UniProtKB/Swiss-Prot annotation:
The keyword Nucleus applies. Residues 20-299 form the Protein kinase domain. SUPFAM superfamilies: Protein kinase-like (PK-like) (SSF56112). It is found in: Cytoplasm; Nucleus. Dually phosphorylated on Thr-171 and Tyr-173, which activates the enzyme. Phosphorylated after osmotic stress. One of its GO terms (cellular component) is nucleus. The active site is at residue 141. This is Mitogen-activated protein kinase hog1. It holds the Pfam family Pkinase. It is an enzyme of class 2 (transferase). Disulfide bonds: none annotated. PANTHER family: MITOGEN-ACTIVATED PROTEIN KINASE. The modification Phosphothreonine is found at residue 171.
Length: 356
């Protein structure tokens, strides 16, 4: 049976198997603490994410289950992948993934990016999104800090905790404001994979300009800034707004014309401007898809249709409408972890489920 080692990180107890050493804090998220560690089995550096009290409420248990299922299902070079998972004696859950040295947010705040890096990063984002969207998954929270990069400029999309099924009736409050698609802000009713394309467009613009494109102070200000550049939304988009208050607000705004993006991005290539124009479109159905973006002239230096795979099968979202007690989520989670280790060839199941 595995030996568990305890360490205090930022006042939090990290309780991990002795396979991992040299714990160093990397970052704190809303639902967990991430540390770097050395995997003594593979001699690689890894990221270890502790999910705090995953079984404290049904909502948190379901969220953790969803993240685990997504990490297990999504297998692609531009998407973060799971290398281990275990439950500690204290019943915290630990996800172990590859460790990349930095993220796009840190890169963008440290120095301007050269053209070839912008191209290569955008290509990898779109390559990852093509795969994720083909699996029937919408990321919903794409932003520079969720895009990890290593010293070879390999890029991986991470943090699928908010990800949801492709569903025309999707609802709710997601995504950091600057990168949030207008249909999320406006309708609060239905959106699809196109929200990720908008977010990627905002990230693309930030790489070109070195600062956020739409830095809104709140929802109202955010939408106002968007219309200053992209003009007033067309009537057919306005007519999809379900909330009367939102509709009143949008109709109260002064009519604005779309500004040429060339005026804003004076140093960018024409092909970069053209692709950005196709990503930042109010009407989601007229936005370029990830597959179309990969074939665009701007990404031509990297585009290879034979090496831009789609998912083998759609992600199974059947659990997502379930309203279950914590104990049921716990049993389902244990089952998923056992399945993961059986498939991956775990040496010993007792290591994953120590006696309580």
């Amino acid at each position: 049976m595995a030996e568990f080692v305890r360490a205090q990180i930022f006042g939090t107890t990290f309780e991990i198997t002795s396979r991992y050493s040299d714990l160093q804090p990397v970052g704190m998220g809303a639902f967990g603490l991430v540390c770097s560690a050395r995997d003594q089995l593979t001699n690689q550096n890894v990221a270890v994410k502790k999910i705090m009290k995953p079984f404290s409420t049904p909502v948190l248990a379901k969220r953790t289950y969803r993240e685990l299922k997504l990490l297990k299902h999504l297998r692609h070079e531009n998407v973060i992948s799971l290398s281990d998972i275990f439950i500690s004696p204290l019943e915290d859950i630990y996800f172990v993934t590859e460790l990349l040295g930095t993220d796009l947010h840190r890169l963008l705040t440290s120095r301007p990016l050269e053209k070839q890096f912008i191209q290569y990063f955008l290509y990898q984002i779109m390559r990852g999104l093509k795969y994720v969207h083909s699996a029937g998954v919408v990321h919903r929270d794409l932003k520079p800090s969720n895009i990890l990069v290593n010293e070879n400029c390999d890029l991986k999309i991470c943090d699928f905790g908010l990800a949801r099924i492709q569903d025309p009736q999707m609802t709710g409050y997601v995504s950091t404001r600057y990168y949030r698609a207008p249909e999320i802000m406006l309708t609060w009713q239905k959106y699809d994979v196109e929200v990720d394309i908008w977010s990627a467009g905002c990230i693309f613009a930030e790489m070109l300009e070195g600062k956020p494109l739409f830095p809104g102070k709140d929802h109202v200000n955010q939408f106002s800034i968007i219309t200053e550049l992209l003009g007033t939304p067309p009537d057919d988009v306005i007519n999809t707004i379900a909330s009367e208050n939102t509709l009143r607000f949008v109709k109260s705004l002064p009519k604005r014309e779309r500004q040429p993006l060339r005026n804003k991005f004076k140093n960018a290539d024409d092909s970069a401007i053209d692709l950005l124009e196709r990503m930042l479109v109010f009407d989601p159905k007229k936005r370029v898809t990830a597959t179309q973006a990969l074939a665009h002239e701007y990404l031509q230096p990297y585009h290879d249709p034979t090496d831009e795979p789609v998912a083998d099968e759609k992600f199974d979202w059947s659990f997502n409408d379930a309203d279950l007690p914590v104990d049921t989520w716990k049993i389902m989670m244990y089952s998923e972890i056992l399945d993961y280790h059986n498939v991956e060839g775990a040496p010993n199941m007792e290591e994953q489920f120590p006696p309580q």
